[in-house]
């Protein structure tokens, strides 16, 4: 008869930018956890929240919640143990809102602007 009765469905990912925004939202609301060991077991039985915002007690993180086990190093400050030299004294781009810009690179500490004039002989011929 020339007609087709078969349908094919497949799953697709959302746009990459949407995934990035969702991960960033989860990153900013991530919770510090620590493993809780049962007395009879050697491995952790669950993770408990160390800090519950706005309330007391502990709770088990949900399967979709982003958690972390230790604080990230502060890359603004020098920390030899973490291998970070910090950002103090580094040149930055005052007009850039991106990673090399002064506002981000200087971690909100402010920055000094230096204007330098350099003269040299160009060996020009007229």
Curated annotation (Swiss-Prot):
SMART domains: WNT1 (SM00097). Glycans are attached at residue 93. Gene3D superfamilies: 3.30.2460.20. Keywords: Developmental protein, Disulfide bond, Extracellular matrix, Glycoprotein, Lipoprotein, Secreted, Wnt signaling pathway. GO terms for cellular component: extracellular space. Pfam families: wnt (PF00110). This is Protein Wnt-7(II). The gene is WNT-7(II).
């Amino acid at each position: 008869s020339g007609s087709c009765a078969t349908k094919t469905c497949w799953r697709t990912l959302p746009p990459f930018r949407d995934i990035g925004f969702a991960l960033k939202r989860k990153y900013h609301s991530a919770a510090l956890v620590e493993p809780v060991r049962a007395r009879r077991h050697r491995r952790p039985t669950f993770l408990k929240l160390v800090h519950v915002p706005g309330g007391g007690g502990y709770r088990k993180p949900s399967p979709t919640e982003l958690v972390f086990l230790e604080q990230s190093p502060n890359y603004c400050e020098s920390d030899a143990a973490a291998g970070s030299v910090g950002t103090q004294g580094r040149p930055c781009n005052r007009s850039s809102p991106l990673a090399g810009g002064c506002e981000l690179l200087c971690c909100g500490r402010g920055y000094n602007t230096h204007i330098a004039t350099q003269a040299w002989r160009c060996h020009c011929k007229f």
